[in-house]
Design a protein with these regions (language model features):
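Short solvent-exposed loop/turn micro-motifs enriched in small/polar/acidic residues
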Residues: 22-24, 85
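Feature of Fe-S/electron-transfer and energy-metabolism proteins
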Residues: 1-2, 6, 115-117
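Short, basic/aromatic recognition patches
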Residues: 7-20
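Zn2+-dependent cytidine deaminase-like catalytic core
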Residues: 40-124
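Short beta-strand scaffold segments in enzyme catalytic cores
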Residues: 26-33
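Charged, amphipathic alpha-helical segments
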Residues: 4, 9, 85-86
Length: 124
């Protein structure tokens, strides 16, 4: 069973680490592996804005670099509860598959969806 609040709390902690001096829009993500480890990510902005990395991709790439390959859920926290961008949806679909995604605002108001509900026709 997925502990949604623990996953949201982990994403909230990650959100506090966001490096977003240009947008001032911190995002945190928490990815749950099949062996119950939580890998976090946060957005990291660059002056060359296209090179900016989103929290969701940082979490997935960090997990992959640590040897994790199977994931069972993800939580994403933004100030207002926004959903992942298209690039992140593609990466989630490609590397995590159709997993539950918990979308939350900073006050823990959340909704649940899945990868393929957000992105029904990924390029995979």
């Amino acid at each position: 069973m997925i502990d949604k609040i623990k996953l949201i709390d982990s994403a909230l902690e990650a959100q506090l680490k966001a490096i977003c001096p240009y947008s001032n829009y911190p995002v945190g993500a928490a990815l749950l592996s099949d062996d119950n480890n939580i890998i976090i990510g946060f957005n990291i902005e660059s002056k060359a804005y296209p090179t900016t990395l989103c929290a969701e991709r940082v979490a997935i790439f960090s997990a992959l670099s640590q040897g994790y390959t199977n994931f069972i859920a993800m939580s994403v926290v933004t100030t207002d509860g926004a959903t992942p961008c298209g690039s992140c949806r593609q990466i989630i679909a490609e590397y995590a598959g159709d997993i539950p995604i918990i979308i939350s605002d900073s006050k823990k108001n959340f909704k649940e969806t899945t990868t393929f509900k957000l992105f029904p026709h990924p390029f995979i």
